[in-house]
Swiss-Prot record:
Belongs to the complex I 20 kDa subunit family. Keywords: 4Fe-4S, Chloroplast, Iron, Iron-sulfur, Membrane, Metal-binding, NAD, NADP, Plastid, Plastoquinone, Quinone, Thylakoid, Translocase, Transport. GO terms for biological process: aerobic respiration; electron transport coupled proton transport; photosynthesis, light reaction. NDH shuttles electrons from NAD(P)H:plastoquinone, via FMN and iron-sulfur (Fe-S) centers, to quinones in the photosynthetic chain and possibly in a chloroplast respiratory chain. The immediate electron acceptor for the enzyme in this species is believed to be plastoquinone. Couples the redox reaction to proton translocation, and thus conserves the redox energy in a proton gradient. Its main location: plastid. One of its GO terms (cellular component) is chloroplast thylakoid membrane. NCBIfam families: nuoB_fam, PRK06411.1. This is NAD(P)H-quinone oxidoreductase subunit K, chloroplastic. NDH is composed of at least 16 different subunits, 5 of which are encoded in the nucleus. It comes from Atropa belladonna (Belladonna). It comes from the Eukaryota. It is a peripheral membrane protein.
Length: 225
């Protein structure tokens, strides 16, 4: 063994030693290389598509869009989720490897939006199907808001503990076979209620048939008086 000393090498190696934990190293590597699966169904996805341009340049965050859920660790749902699309969304989430994250973008994804009141086929919130990490409200959210949501997700990943993530996986498991959607008959048929539509305010207590029958039997001068 050659006993030649390398003082410069020893000094350089001593000054460049980094001590960390395996958990912090894993978090640092994941937060800088998020690979999103873009699940866009409505106008909110158009706002996210503007991030690809040079004005916002989302490549600087390490985002690499993937077309396969098996290669993604982040799914971004943007737009309305219907009952027929719900099993497909859950299956995509199940096919993603652990650890995986979800960003719910837009009012339609979070609460159902304007379709949540009288729509029979809209899911009232994607968190009823899969666990959501970051909620991004808006109709639609601006690209700056999307960047802020990604930044908050990166901060969450940096503070994450491996034990907590394993514990949450046992609680927030979503299986496709457990989601049984029953489509019930809606009371909103789309037909106008003729009694409400043609009923004057002054004759609200008079049935429609009696009112029009009396109106046709009375002459014009009597109506004027």
């Amino acid at each position: 063994m050659n006993s030649i000393q390398f003082p410069l090498l020893d000094r350089t190696a001593q000054n460049s030693v980094i001590s960390t934990t395996l958990n912090d190293l894993s978090n640092w590597s994941r937060l800088s290389s998020l690979w999103p699966l873009l699940y866009g169904t409505s106008c909110c996805f158009i706002e996210f598509a503007s991030l690809i341009g040079s004005r916002f340049d989302f490549d600087r965050y390490g985002l690499v869009p993937r077309s396969s859920p098996r290669q993604a660790d982040l799914i971004l749902t943007a737009g309305t989720v219907t009952m027929k699309m719900a099993p497909s969304l859950v299956r995509l989430y199940e096919q993603m490897p652990e650890p995986k994250y979800v960003i719910a973008m837009g009012a339609c994804t979070i609460t159902g939006g304007m379709f949540s009141t009288d729509s029979y086929s809209t899911v009232r919130g994607v968190d009823k199907l899969i666990p959501v990490d970051v909620y991004l409200p808006g109709c639609p959210p601006k690209p700056e808001a999307v960047i802020d949501a990604i930044t908050k997700l990166r901060k969450k990943i940096s503070r994450e503990l491996y034990e907590d993530r394993i514990r949450s996986q046992r609680v927030n498991r979503c299986f496709t076979t457990n989601h049984k959607f029953h489509v019930r008959r809606s009371i909103h048929t789309g037909n106008y209620d003729q009694r409400v539509l043609y009923q004057p305010p002054s004759t609200s207590e008079i049935p429609t048939e009696i009112f029009f029958k009396y109106k046709n039997s009375v002459s014009s001068p009597e109506l004027v008086n």
